[in-house]
From Swiss-Prot:
Substrate binds at residue 89. It comes from Vibrio parahaemolyticus serotype O3:K6 (strain RIMD 2210633). The keyword ATP-binding applies. Its cofactor is Mg(2+); Mn(2+). Pfam families: Acetate_kinase (PF00871). The lineage of its organism: Bacteria, Pseudomonadati, Pseudomonadota, Gammaproteobacteria, Vibrionales. This is Acetate kinase 1. It comes from the Bacteria. Keywords: ATP-binding, Cytoplasm, Kinase, Magnesium, Metal-binding, Nucleotide-binding, Transferase. It catalyses: acetate + ATP = acetyl phosphate + ADP. Homodimer. Catalyzes the formation of acetyl phosphate from acetate and ATP. Can also catalyze the reverse reaction. The active site is at 146 (proton donor/acceptor). It is found in: Cytoplasm.
Length: 398
């Protein structure tokens, strides 16, 4: 029986897709539709070479998925005819979903109910699910939740110091994101260290335009930096991460900002974008560090925040840390950021191997600390698509 899974990841203005063999991890197709809802909406894909096409002015998720089915997959019948199931990345599952789920009407309603917790993401996921059901009515669909891995967090980690009834009645608590990536890295480290997953203690740094840190104890998430929403925690591309909540009142009451303006500022105009006042692109910050004030400022704040989180999470691991790991677009490719962060953690006896660190870029992986380092640091490429494909195959009965 075929175990080819179509993996879909619908963002607010993008659609990432892949066809993955859940049995051996082979990726037969990958692509990205981006700038959706804008005049420059386009789609790029890798299938027997690299390709790109314009989707048309204002094209949305439905048009992107239709192009993928009717043009890309249609050019490779052996792929489309052997698709066995569809897996969907879903950012927020609240407390309702502690693991991946076969999509039914009830599950779809549950995802819709969580939309207020991820207003940029969950509505897009719902569009993708419904479009996939329409395009492939015979295939089972599975939802794989970013929040599920973090449902093992203890109360001391997920509760906010707010009136308790806000949690009991409204579910206001820390949920965390990037769980699929944190889970994959945990499994990879177990293999690299020749340990059972249940014995692995790591601090994983998933660094991309969105970024989070996760403390993993005995193979389970015990704390993570993102909170009720993906806004909390680290400095990100356009998101502010941790701030004094009273800043919001000051912006509203003293400076006259509307709630909508504050929301836009914190989610789309802050982070590296806000600190540089130029761009959210980490490559600009890295390339101009020490030469341009705005780049230096942004990189220092980014690394300071990340190092503080890593250091703080050592307190959750009962005195044993097997490795610090870096993944995600920035984590896998930015040697300067990794070195700056690890150098700030010298109190833990960490020593960076600069040569190994430079080699661990653009697909390179491995240990980036010296043999004398008390704690190893590693670069590992994440593969969320594989985790989604494996869970989808399992729940679809493939």
């Amino acid at each position: 029986m075929s175990k080819l899974v179509l993996v879909l990841n619908c963002g607010s203005s993008s659609l990432k897709f892949a066809v993955v063999d859940a049995e051996n991890g082979e990726e037969h197709l990958s692509g990205l539709a981006e700038c959706l809802h804008l005049p420059e909406a386009r789609i790029k894909w890798k299938l027997d070479g690299k390709h790109e096409a314009q989707l048309g002015n204002g094209a949305a998720h439905e048009e992107a998925l239709a192009f993928m089915v009717e043009t890309i997959l249609a050019s490779k019948p052996e792929l489309s005819e052997n698709l066995a199931a569809i897996g969907h990345r879903v950012v927020h599952g609240g407390e309702q979903f502690t693991q991946s789920a076969l999509i039914t009407d009830d599950v779809l309603k549950g995802i819709e109910d969580c939309a207020t917790l991820a207003p940029l993401h969950n509505p897009a996921h719902i569009i993708g699910i419904k479009a996939a059901q329409k395009s492939f009515p015979a295939l089972k669909n599975v939802a794989v939740f970013d929040t599920a891995f973090h449902q093992t967090m203890p109360e001391e980690s997920y509760l906010y110091a707010l009136p308790y009834n806000l949690y009991k009645e409204h579910g206001i608590r820390r949920y965390g994101m990037h769980g699929t990536s944190h889970l994959f890295i945990t499994r990879e480290v177990a293999g690299l260290l020749n340990k059972p997953v249940e014995e692995v203690n790591i601090i994983n740094c998933h660094l991309g335009n969105g970024a989070s840190v996760c403390a993993v104890k005995n193979g389970q998430s015990v704390d993570t930096s993102m909170g009720l929403t993906p806004l909390e925690g680290l400095v990100m591309g356009t998101r502010c991460g941790d701030i004094d909540p009273a800043i919001i009142f000051h912006l509203h009451d003293t400076l006259g900002y509307s709630v909508e303006k504050i929301n836009t500022m914190l989610t789309k105009e802050s982070g590296l974008q806000g600190l540089t006042e130029v761009t959210s692109d980490c490559r600009f910050v890295e390339d101009n560090y020490g030469e341009k004030e705005e780049a230096t400022r942004a990189m220092d704040v980014f690394c300071h925040r990340l190092a503080k989180y890593v250091a703080g999470y050592t307190a959750t691991l009962d005195g044993r840390l097997d490795a610090i790991t870096f993944t995600g677009g920035i984590g896998e490719n930015s040697a300067p950021i990794r070195e700056m962060v690890l150098n700030r953690l010298g109190i833990f006896g960490i020593e960076v191997d600069s040569e190994a660190n430079l080699k661990a870029r653009f697909g390179g992986e491995g240990v980036i600390t010296t043999e004398n380092s008390r704690i190893p640091a590693m670069v590992i490429s994440t593969n969320e698509e594989l985790v989604i494909a494996e869970d989808t195959a399992r729940l679809a009965g493939l």
